[in-house]
Amino acid sequence: MTPAGSLLVARDLHKSYGSTPALDGASFSVHPGEIVAVLGPSGSGKSTLLHCLAGIITPDSGTVSYAGRELSAMSDAERSALRRSDFGFVFQFGQLVPELTCVENVALPLRLSGTRRKDAERTALRWMERLEVDDLGAKRPGEVSGGQGQRVAIARALVSSPKVIFADEPTGALDSLNGERVMQLLGEAARSANVAVVLVTHEARVAAYSDRDVTVRDGRARDLEHTA
C-alpha cells in the first residue's frame, strides 16, 4: 500500500542498541481507521518499530511523519503533547493505576487535559459501556479479571478521541477466548470512531482482526495484503 492518504508514515528506519541492530531499513504506513497488524518473532524489531512510530524513541536514521509532519522536527514537549492528544496506548498488562477505580483510570487522560471530573467520568462510562465493562466502574484493577482489565485499558486509550492507537501484544496475557473478545471489541470501537490501530503481535489469530499485515524480520518490514 502506498503512503498516499496515510496518517502515519515511516521511511527507511534504522535503530541499533549498541552494536545490535533492531531496525534495518523498516518502512510502514497506516491510513485513518485502518487496523494494521505488525507480526514477527521475538527480537525481530516489531516493538522497536511501534515505539519509533509513537515517538517514544528516536530512530538513528529514517523519518516518521504524522499528519504530514516529521516527529523529529517536533520538540520533546510537542511530541509529549501529541501522545496525549492524538495517540492512545494499550499494553500487554494494561498498566492501569492500581490505586484508582476503573472509571477513574479511564477518565484519567481527560482529567490530565483539564476536563472536569464529572464530565470526564461521564465520558469514561460511555466508553466502558461500549467495551462491556461499565459495571466495573467502582472496582479497582486488582478486583477484575485480566480480560476485563484489558477492556478497561482499551476504553482508556479511546476516551480522549485519539487518531491512532498503539497496541503492543494486547492479548498476550489472556487466554484464547478472552483474547478474541478483546480483539473484537477493540476492532469494533476503533472502526466506529475511525481510529487507526497499530497492533503488535506474534499470534496469527490476533492478526486476523486486522485489515492488513506487516511482517517484521531482522529489522525489516514487509507489507502483506490481508486475506482473512
Regions found by a protein language model. Give the residues of each.
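ABC-family P-loop ATPase nucleotide-binding domain
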Residues: 1-14, 222-228
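ABC family nucleotide-binding domain
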Residues: 6-216
